[in-house]
Amino acid sequence: MPRVKGGIVTRRRHKKILKLAKGYFGSKHRLFKSANAQVMKSLLYAYRDRRQKKRDFRKLWITRINAQARMNGLSYSRLMHGLKVAGIEVNRKMLADLAVNDKAAFNELATVAKSKLNA
């Protein structure tokens, strides 16, 4: 049985990694060893930050809701509790959008929440 060298397999594997490393600075897009390390690190960052993005957006929504709620004389937590007691199920993403783009509608929700808290 003749000896089979892995040249084609290795070249394919290297090409695949170097293709993923396109656009990286310096040797990180030229040399396989440093490109491979950087691609692995980049994939880890991408995986981590897909989860981080969800947390970041939730924090942003809460900040926007809180700012508008305080203009209506409520804290964020009291507003959310008031809405829950009133049976209004609006998620934070929609509330934040209302707080930025439709202040009148947000103010209506805030007055409803305030009245349910006082009642």
Swiss-Prot record:
Q: What does this protein do?
A: Binds directly to 23S ribosomal RNA and is necessary for the in vitro assembly process of the 50S ribosomal subunit. It is not involved in the protein synthesizing functions of that subunit.
Please name the gene that encodes this protein: rplT
Q: Which GO biological process categories is it annotated with?
A: ribosomal large subunit assembly; translation
One GO cellular component term, please give it: ribosome
Q: Domain of life here?
A: Bacteria
Which keywords accompany this UniProt record? Ribonucleoprotein, Ribosomal protein, RNA-binding, rRNA-binding
Please indicate if the UniProt record lists Ribosomal protein as a keyword.
yes
Membership in a protein family: Belongs to the bacterial ribosomal protein bL20 family.
Query: What organism is the protein native to?
Result: Brevibacillus brevis (strain 47 / JCM 6285 / NBRC 100599)
Put simply, this protein is called Large ribosomal subunit protein bL20
